[in-house]
């Protein structure tokens, strides 16, 4: 009888040893989890004209109200060549083609261009909430002795979308002074 009990115990231990173990997932700190925002995403076409040169580009504008604006410029085949990230305090311009980026406050940025660019204007451009309410926007900025005219054709209004929007990591780009671009 005791021999049978020992055999049953050994068989149960072998069966229990072959069972799968539950894996406990690691605890992720709250700071490292990106939060969801309601983001207005717009695709548009922009035409940039400078001293006899005309460039057409597709742009994607993402705006999280009163927080972040991201403008991606894709002049050919959907390849992002330039990215502009703006917060209410600063503007980050990333040139992916040359591997460079520059950070500037609106004060520094506006020392080199006219008319002045503000957070409010940038947010209105990206969300197509311009005062005239039209489907086209025409902007003209001058820096150094060069004038850039930008025409934006907005598509039909796109809906707010829940999205995780993150700033582009700049550690893989070389930081330069904004005046080298302006």
Go through the PLM ranges and name each one.
Residues 55-58, 79-81, 147-151:
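Short, surface-exposed coil-to-beta transition loops
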Residues 3-11:
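Sec-dependent signal peptide recognition
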């Amino acid at each position: 009888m005791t021999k049978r009990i020992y055999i049953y115990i050994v068989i149960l231990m072998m069966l229990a040893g072959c069972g799968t173990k539950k894996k406990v997932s690691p605890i992720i700190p709250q700071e490292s989890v990106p939060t969801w925002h309601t983001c207005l995403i717009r695709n548009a076409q922009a035409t940039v004209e400078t001293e006899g040169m005309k460039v057409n580009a597709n742009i994607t504008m993402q705006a999280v109200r009163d927080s972040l604006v991201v403008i991606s410029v894709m002049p050919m085949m959907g390849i992002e060549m330039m990215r502009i990230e703006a917060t209410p305090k600063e503007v980050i311009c990333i040139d992916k083609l040359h591997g460079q980026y520059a950070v500037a406050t609106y004060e520094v940025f506006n020392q080199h261009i006219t008319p002045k660019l503000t957070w409010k204007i940038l947010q209105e451009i990206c969300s197509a909430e311009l005062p005239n309410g039209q489907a086209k926007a025409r902007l003209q900025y001058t820096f150094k002795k060069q004038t850039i005219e930008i025409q934006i054709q907005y598509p039909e209004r796109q809906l707010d979308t829940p999205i995780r929007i993150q700033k582009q990591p700049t550690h893989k780009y070389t930081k330069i002074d904004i005046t080298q671009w302006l």
